[in-house]
């Protein structure tokens, strides 16, 4: 099996789209996606505990989860018919070598609430969405293509420079800022 994976953060939204395309397969193929969840701030690490809510709640095209009160819901949806198999379980000791090299703690436990399963055929693309808002699964392919089109071509030095500079401009209402240290300051 040869599978292509493309990730896109959607501009001005808290949404990640992941497109999987089956480029080659010699037999019937099933795609199984098992999201690992942390629900923590960017400086903390998650450890297995009895307080995490491992339940998943059905929404169109997927499920929503919130491991702890006070966090937003995480909506995970697919643009194709799929089955979500609830199977909550902790996975232990994920290692972040870069963090350890920097002198920070670098081991984390992550909870999975289950997995998505769908059939996929050669040449087919499937889009998986993670967002703090529920979306219409029927629009995921359009959203992916629009985000691709919105991005500038980075074919020469000047267009690369413009693209890089835009990543450090943050707008909050009518206020515009240039951020130093992005994204570590939460802007």
Regions found by a protein language model. Name each.
Residues 1-187:
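Acidic, mature catalytic/reactive cores of soluble proteins
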């Amino acid at each position: 099996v040869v599978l292509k994976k493309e990730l896109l953060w959607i501009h001005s939204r808290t949404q990640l789209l992941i497109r999987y395309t089956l480029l080659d397969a010699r037999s019937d193929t099933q795609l199984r996606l098992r999201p690992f969840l942390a629900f923590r701030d960017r400086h903390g690490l998650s450890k297995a505990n009895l307080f995490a809510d491992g339940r998943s709640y059905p929404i169109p095209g997927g499920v929503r989860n919130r491991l702890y009160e006070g966090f937003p819901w995480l909506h995970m949806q697919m643009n194709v018919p799929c089955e979500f198999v609830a199977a909550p379980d902790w996975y232990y000791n994920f290692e972040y070598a870069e963090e350890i090299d920097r002198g920070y703690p670098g081991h984390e436990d992550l909870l999975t609430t289950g997995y998505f399963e769908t059939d996929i055929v050669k040449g087919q693309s499937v889009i998986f969405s993670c967002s703090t808002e529920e979306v219409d699964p029927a629009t995921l392919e359009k959203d992916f293509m629009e985000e691709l089109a919105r991005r500038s071509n980075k074919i020469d030095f000047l267009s690369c420079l413009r693209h890089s500079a835009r990543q450090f401009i943050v707008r909050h209402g009518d206020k515009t800022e240039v951020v130093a240290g992005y994204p570590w300051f939460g802007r």
